[in-house]
Amino acid sequence: MIARIHHVGVVVQDLDAGLEFWRDTLELPLLRSADLPDQGVRAALLACGTGEVEVLAPTTPDSGVARFLASRGEGVHHVCFESDDVVREVRRFIGTGVDMIDGKPRQGLAGKVAFVHPRACAKLLVELATPSGRAPLPETPLALVAVHGKVEDVGAAAQRLQDLFGMNRGFAAEDGSFVQLSLTGLMLQLTPLGGGFPKPGFTALRLRAGDLSALARRLGERGIPCQENAVGLVVPPGPGAGAPLIVEAGR
């Protein structure tokens, strides 16, 4: 059974720079990190509210993460759904004709993991994971709220994610320009291609900060630009961040 969105994967050029941003500047607790030579990456998982952020950097030029970085630059790489039995989930998907990158689960930083092929998910990269343990997450100054994505057909993509992962449909624009999906409080917000994004993929993260002014001060002290808008702060992609961030105030 798929229970929740476990984490969002963000690709950066250098993991140390990524940790400097996510751990040191945003003050997210580091849960664990590891070199994964069989996957050609270094990775770190950080707590972020009820979810987690996985920061990935390539260690070999032929890894999937390296290819992503070469073609798209730093950015949001994947969304991971937690299952209580990823082996069963993979068998179910294969049995119903869903294309998988991993025909069998393998060990990853989040536990036993398997990636669904993007062609089965509206060209979005999705991971399944069964964590090896389920310790309570520490309190964090920021919480992951939503992942923004661009797709070719918003309605079809939303239906596919509902069918595969049991996501709940929320607000949807009548003209098909926006659909909001959720699972245990975390949201995916889908819009059509455009606005500088010619290919389907995840484009930005929305976070919530308990103290928005303190975050703005920390960003300023480290020379990281941010802009205020009606929602809160917008942090453009920069070294280590890996993705545009939209940060709103609230608990």
Residue ranges and their predicted role:
Residues 90-143, 179-189, 213-251:
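Vicinal oxygen chelate
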Residues 172-206, 210-216:
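Intrinsically disordered, low-complexity segments enriched in Gly and acidic/Ser/Thr residues
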Residues 1-9, 15-47, 52-58:
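An N-terminus-focused feature that recognizes amino-terminal "leader" regions
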Residues 140-190:
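A mid-sequence, solvent-exposed acidic-amphipathic segment
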Residues 1-19, 74-83, 129-158, 202-205:
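N-terminal beta-strand motif that seeds the catalytic metal site of vicinal oxygen chelate
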